[in-house]
Each structure stands twice: as structure tokens, then as C-alpha cells.
């Protein structure tokens, strides 16, 4: 079973220590009552991975680990088999001892769009909401973050993160917890909070923005990345049953509308830092994620539209400060 004791010890003497009033009981209840039916299979794959300590670790330009002398072909094959037991891999890519995990998303491209616009992460304590496999947590550590904490209720992603951590030498600077943002107390302890690819899945987007704000220290920075539509500050798309084949999409505002929402929630210095159309090069089917992807979600005759006839995915990055 995944143990969280190292994380508890890590936060016990710092600004996150009030979290210990609720977190251990939450995670104990999760382990007793909420495990996914496949969790034991996934965790078994993690347990059978070797504990490797790279001689070369690059978290600055990617997530890449090498060892000298290199691991054997047999070791690499065994490692690949265990990692494939954790498919589908959606967020990455990872390059581990000669094995490349080509994930559905080129999350490194998103990072390249975000990084130039945010405050330096060196020395910061960071929360990443909806962190997936934890790819961006490692990139945050690569930028010098003191501690990067990810939360995501999807248990496969937790196992993927623990697998990568094990192959990176058990690095304790990044941690993933199987929680949603609504399960966190108002910690007001993070220097930077990231919410990327989450807002459009929330039934109450303004509540989500308040939840993010409540995790930030005074003068802390929010990095918000989400789907948007073209339009003025009054423009919001409320899709019907599905958007790009996703059922749980509720509100897709324009970037100016999202800026207004952030200001309404009390954020200041709000700016639209980047906008980019999602391409089938950035999100696609791979050998590590073999089901349908963006190409199947777009109108085959007009890639400016989804199969439902809505505008194709356009993503914006907004930066804001908690006063």
C-alpha cells in the first residue's frame, strides 16, 4: 500500500503543518473505503519496478533519467512491462533509462507555453490541482521548487506518479495525493497554485476559483490554464451533452470573461498570458495511450469544429495574484 508518512514528516514543521489536522484521517479512510477495483493490480506493477537512482537526471528540459553503466536489455524490458500495466499514459513524456513513454499529451509543450509568463519557481511551495501523472510536478522541481504537491482523485495517476518517482531514485521533493480540491482545508500556504485543464470540468467554476485562492499565501500566484472560446467578456459556451466527446464539460468562457471571473473572485493583476489551439500533434493516440484522442473528437471535414459542431479546443493561460 502507498504510504504517505514521508509527506507527513516533510510538512510537519512548515506552513503546511495545519493540514495534518485532517489529512491522515482522510487518506486512511481513502485506503479503507475508496480503492479502485484495479488499484491492487496497478500498485503491484509499481512494487515490481526496480528502485533505480539515475546517474544523470534532467528535470529542466524534460523528465529524463540515465544510468552509467546503462541498465541491461532485460531490466529495461521488465521495466517496460510494469509501466505498460499502468496504461493509458496521458501526461508526459518521460525518458527513463533508454525507454521513452510517448504519452497522449505533449505536456512539455504546455509547460513551454506557461513557463515564460510565471514568477520564478525557485524555493517555492507549489500546489498543482488535477496533476495527472505528475509530469508538471517534476518540471516544477526542475525549476528549483522547494516542494511540489499534486492532487488528483484518479488513482491510476497516483500509481503512475509513484512508478516514476521510484525510477527517479525515490525523490521526495514532489508528492501526489488522491484528493480533489474540495477536500482541502483553506491552507493559505502555497506560493504558487496551478490549475491546468480542470476548470471546464467544474459545475461551479467560480467556487473552483475561490478554492484555488484559499490555498494561496498573500501575494501568491495563480496559474490557470483551461479551455476558452473566442469572444468578449460576456461570451460563455455551455455545451450540451458532450464537448469533444467529453461528457463532464460545463462552462467554457472566453478569455476576457475568465479574466472578469478572476477579478470578481478578488484576484488582482490578472492577465491573459497565452492562447493556443490544441493540435493533433499535441494530443494524439500513441503506443502508450491506444484509445481515441483528439483526431477522433474533431469534425473530420473541418478541424475548426468538434464532432458536435462546437469550436475546436482553444486553451488559454491566465496569471493572477491573491492580494
Curated annotation (Swiss-Prot):
Membrane-spanning intervals of the chain: none
For whether the record's keyword set contains Coiled coil, the answer is no
- What is the top EC class of this enzyme, as a single word? transferase
Catalyzed chemical reaction(s):
carboxy-S-adenosyl-L-methionine + 5-hydroxyuridine(34) in tRNA = 5-carboxymethoxyuridine(34) in tRNA + S-adenosyl-L-homocysteine + H(+)
Q: Which Gene3D superfamilies match?
A: Vaccinia Virus protein VP39
Q: Which InterPro entries does the record cross-reference, listed alphabetically?
A: CmoB, Mo5U34_MeTrfas-like, SAM-dependent_MTases_sf
What Gene Ontology molecular-function terms does this entry list? methyltransferase activity; transferase activity, transferring alkyl or aryl (other than methyl) groups
Q: Which UniProt keywords apply?
A: Transferase, tRNA processing
One annotated GO biological process: tRNA wobble uridine modification
| Subunit relationships | Homotetramer.
The family assignment reads: Belongs to the class I-like SAM-binding methyltransferase superfamily. CmoB family.
- Name assigned to this protein: tRNA U34 carboxymethyltransferase
Organism name? Yersinia pestis
Amino acid at each position: 500500500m502507498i504510504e504517505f508518512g514521508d509527506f507527513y514528516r516533510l510538512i510537519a514543521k512548515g506552513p503546511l503543518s495545519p493540514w495534518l489536522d485532517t489529512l491522515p484521517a482522510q487518506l486512511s479512510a481513502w485506503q479503507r473505503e475508496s480503492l479502485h477495483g484495479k488499484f491492487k493490480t496497478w500498485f503491484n506493477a509499481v512494487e515490481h519496478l526496480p528502485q533505480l537512482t539515475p546517474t544523470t537526471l534532467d528535470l529542466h528540459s524534460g523528465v529524463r533519467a540515465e544510468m552509467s553503466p546503462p541498465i541491461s536489455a532485460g531490466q529495461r524490458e521488465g521495466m517496460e512491462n510494469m509501466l505498460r500495466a499502468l496504461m493509458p499514459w496521458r501526461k508526459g513524456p518521460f525518458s527513463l533509462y533508454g525507454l521513452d513513454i510517448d504519452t497522449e499529451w505533449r505536456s512539455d509543450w504546455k509547460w513551454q507555453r506557461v513557463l515564460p509568463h510565471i514568477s520564478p519557481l525557485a524555493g517555492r511551495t507549489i500546489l498543482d490541482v488535477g496533476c495527472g501523472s505528475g509530469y508538471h510536478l517534476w518540471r516544477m522541481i526542475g525549476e528549483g521548487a522547494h516542494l511540489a504537491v499534486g492532487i488528483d482523485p484518479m488513482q491510476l495517476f497516483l500509481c503512475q506518479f509513484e512508478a516514476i518517482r521510484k525510477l527517479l531514485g525515490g525523490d521526495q521533493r514532489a508528492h501526489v495525493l488522491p484528493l480533489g480540491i474540495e477536500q482541502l482545508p483553506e491552507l493559505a500556504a502555497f506560493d504558487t497554485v496551478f490549475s491546468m485543464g480542470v476548470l471546464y470540468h467544474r459545475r461551479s467554476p467560480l467556487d473552483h476559483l475561490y478554492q484555488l485562492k484559499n490555498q494561496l499565501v498573500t501575494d501568491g500566484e495563480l496559474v490557470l490554464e483551461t479551455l476558452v472560446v473566442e469572444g468578449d467578456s460576456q461570451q460563455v459556451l455551455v455545451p450540451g451533452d458532450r464537448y469533444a466527446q467529453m461528457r463532464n464539460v460545463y462552462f467554457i468562457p472566453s478569455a476576457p470573461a475568465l479574466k472578469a471571473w478572476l477579478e470578481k473572485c478578488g484576484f488582482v493583476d490578472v492577465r491573459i498570458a497565452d492562447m493556443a489551439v490544441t493540435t493533433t500533434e499535441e494530443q494524439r493516440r500513441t503506443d502508450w495511450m491506444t484509445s481515441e484522442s483528439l483526431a477522433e473528437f474533431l469534425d473530420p471535414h473541418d478541424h475548426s469544429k468538434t464532432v458536435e459542431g462546437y469550436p475546436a479546443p482553444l486553451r488559454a493561460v491566465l496569471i493572477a495574484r491573491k492580494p
